[in-house]
Design a protein with these regions (language model features):
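Short, amphipathic alpha-helical interaction segments positioned at domain boundaries
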Residues: 7-8, 56-65
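Short alpha-helical interface patches
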Residues: 24, 28, 44, 58-59
Length: 65
């Protein structure tokens, strides 16, 4: 679980202020399969055509700084 929390922090850094960055999205997709599945299951990430995207409205709601 601690590894998953650390990866949430990485995602938070990549998508800071809710701005989606295509280059950073590629880095997010490098997470191991189990972590991506867990994030998708938590509805923080959505997976489309093998690419991983942040569910920005949920991100903005949960992680507003």
């Amino acid at each position: 679980m601690n590894i998953l929390i650390n990866k949430f922090k990485v995602i938070r850094y990549f998508i800071k202020n809710g701005i989606f960055n295509e280059e950073k999205a590629i880095e997010i997709s490098k997470f191991d399969h189990n972590t991506i599945d867990a994030l998708v299951h938590s509805q923080l990430l959505v997976q489309v055509d093998g690419r991983v995207y942040l569910d920005k409205p949920l991100y903005d709601y949960r992680y507003k700084e």
